[in-house]
Amino acid sequence: YCIKKVAVLNCWGKMRAWGNHMVHHAIYYKQNYSYAGVIEALSGAPFDVKFISFDDIRKDPHILDDIDVILNIGDADTAYTGGDNWTDEKIVTAVKKFIYNGGGFIGVGEPTGHQYQGHFLQLATVMGVEKETGFTLNADKYNWEEHDHFIKEDCTKEIDFGEGKKSMFALDGAAILVQREKEVQMAVN
């Protein structure tokens, strides 16, 4: 029984299904252990998990029609998150249309990360977070208050984000769920 259909979006799609964030027989690497747990959690969750690539979306944007949630997981400018695939208007339009029509989007790490047209995270305005790379140092950033949310209701301990991410900040309107030393670790928009 599966309650939702989840798509993991990366450059490989089905080619590396379930092998995401594993290198050389799943040896521990500081750079990817923070993400491996997401894929592991999906393997035991009641979701129908599909691995799709950016080329799959280019070929047929309707591939997203039967998906409930898209996950984009990893560091910026890697095959995990897509790098310059996020400069392709067809990709951005298809994913934003999916979200506009009620689909969920969960980003972990630096999702949609690629410096382009004034943004580092190409879906920053959708996710409600952006990474400070030096281009927005002059912009005021007042959204630092943490909020309660149903996502954290069952958490009895401090959430472990692994390595976490530095220099992430919330845009106006986003709700910060966890920030550490004014670096957003979890937010909803």
What residues fall within each predicted segment?
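Aromatic-Pro/Gly-enriched surface loop or interdomain linker
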Residues: Y1-I67
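Extracellular ligand-binding/catalytic regions of CAZymes and related secreted enzymes
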Residues: Y1-I3, A41-G44, H62-I63, G74, ...
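The substrate-binding groove and active-site-proximal loops of carbohydrate-active enzymes
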Residues: H21-Q31, D48, N72-D88
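Short, well-ordered alpha-helix to beta-strand connector turns
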Residues: D66-D68, G173-A174
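Short, solvent-exposed loop/turn segments at secondary-structure junctions
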Residues: W12-M15, D56-I57, A76-T78, P111-H114, ...
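Catalytic beta-strand/loop cores that center a nucleophilic Ser/Cys/Thr
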Residues: W18, N138-N189
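A glycine-rich, often tryptophan-bearing local segment used as a flexible ligand/cofactor-contacting loop or short
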Residues: D77, G82-D160
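Structural motif
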Residues: D68-D75, I106
